[in-house]
Amino acid sequence: MTKSVEGLVSVVLGAQWGDEGKGKLVDLLSESCSVVCRCQGGNNAGHTVVAGGQEYFFHLLPSGIVNPNVLAVIGNGVVVNLQALFQEIDEAVCKGLLDVSSRLRISDRCHLVFDIHQEIDRMEEELRGENSLGTTKKGIGPTYSSKVTRNGLRVCDLMGDWVQFTAKYKELVKYVKRRYPKLGINVEESLEKLSGMVCDSVILINKLVKSKQANILVEGAQSCMLDIDFGTYPHVTSSNCSVGGVCTGLGLSPSRVGRVYGVIKAYTTRVGSGPFPSELLDGIGEFIQKKGCEWGVTTKRKRRIGWLDTVVIRYAHIINDFNALALTKIDVLDDLEEVKIAKAYIDPETGRELDSFPSDSSVLNHVVVVYETLPGWKTSTHGCRVYEELPTAAKVFVETVEKLLNIPIRWIGTGASRDSIIIRSV
């Protein structure tokens, strides 16, 4: 890992529509970190890490917890489903992770996801019919709605007076005019499990930053194009997945954010509905989907496939100002005769190139995409660990992407395992 500026926090963010392979970069960078944090989202996120021959699926736990020397922090911007969290902890322990509970800290300001939120999520998606947003139905959006309307419940409420907590929960149910459901958790057992993990994460993180003794890494969930403000609204998630969410989701000053790393796939994927200019609806897309094992970690839904879209990534760069990029899954493209890169959008009515990323999804749905077409390399890149080992055409692909984006590509993923990665000195 590039040495962090003393006292500053490093951040890993997705620059497409999620599922870029952020977990792999976090796993690599966390080897030289002492603290890894989540700052937003909930168990609608899905990170996969392959370590020691074991495959781990993370939804709420920071994936950097795979490193046994890391303290994992779930920040105040995360919404927490306790059942899902405890199940994830149990599964991680069963797979051999050590001291998970003792290495985990949960902000007492985290809002709680209840079954009522999940039921609202399901019902709202059904009511939308063919205009559904394709949510994970995990109750994340309704929980953030409760937070914004100021009738949500937080971890600190659960840890406080139970009578008051019950009264607040009844008010929540009354507000959304739903029948009082069961919590679906054993409250006393949950309190016992939580007792050693809950803390004021704002104080904890800022003390660690000011001490200049902790190397802190923040792993973003979802991605910039799913950001509630900057994504392809309304087909977005309910939190800020961009660099601003790091500050609000952890209680950090912007001046504490040091390096920001973006993660992109060598192609593009998207789960659920929403505009997707470079989408492939032919046999090539189907081939990439199968070879890349493109199924949602959380939803198990088949991911939509498209060519790498540099218009999207340039827009994400404007918002996040990436210091460097990780390009993942280049090996999935090994068998293709040619590879395309989206480099511009044309307005079909005027014939002119758009000078900015459209905020209106209806406009984005109708843009004409301009592609750069490159020859495929027709040679396996799987497991390559040195840049010079890549076929010439694969290196041309990487360098063309760099040129179109004007951002250095420091890491190149060449397989699922944690050591299938090329680290470039750029």
UniProtKB/Swiss-Prot annotation:
Source organism: Schistosoma mansoni
One BP term from GO: 'de novo' AMP biosynthetic process
Record's catalysed reaction(s): IMP + L-aspartate + GTP = N(6)-(1,2-dicarboxyethyl)-AMP + GDP + phosphate + 2 H(+)
Subcellular location: Cytoplasm
Name of the molecule in the record: Adenylosuccinate synthetase
Keywords for the protein's UniProt record, in alphabetical order: Cytoplasm, GTP-binding, Ligase, Magnesium, Metal-binding, Nucleotide-binding, Purine biosynthesis
Annotated residues for binding of substrate: 297-303
NCBIfam families in the cross-refs: PRK01117.1, purA
GO CC terms, sorted: cytoplasm
Residue numbers binding IMP: 19-22, 44-47, 136, 150, 222, 237, 301
Single GO molecular function: magnesium ion binding
Co-factor(s): Mg(2+)
